[in-house]
Amino acid sequence: VTAAALMGAAMLASLPAQAAGAKTTCGGASWYALTSRTASGERMNPMAMTAAHKTLPLGSKVKVTNLSNRRSVVVRINDRGPFVKGRMIDLSKGAAQRLGFISAGHTRVQIEPADGSGTRDCA
């Protein structure tokens, strides 16, 4: 194994993960604003563009679109949840503000890979 191969593998491993190969999904979203540690070990920053998802890999990035107003934001998955029936993703307060559903508390969203490789539209 060459030093160049090892360096290339290390660089690839450090790149932000995309939810590659993931399908577009639609469902409920809510928001939360804790300051405790997330499943990834980092402290939750309520204003960061982050989210909790039950199965997407930690560190992956997804585009979330609010289906009621078509606003979108790219978030990084850094936590696990939500654990409420009918909810697919829990967004940080900052992401929810950008999506325009703070006062409602929840909304219906489309979740797709941030790289645009999603396979369908929920609208």
Describe every region a protein language model picked out.
Residues T2-A123:
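Secreted/periplasmic proteins
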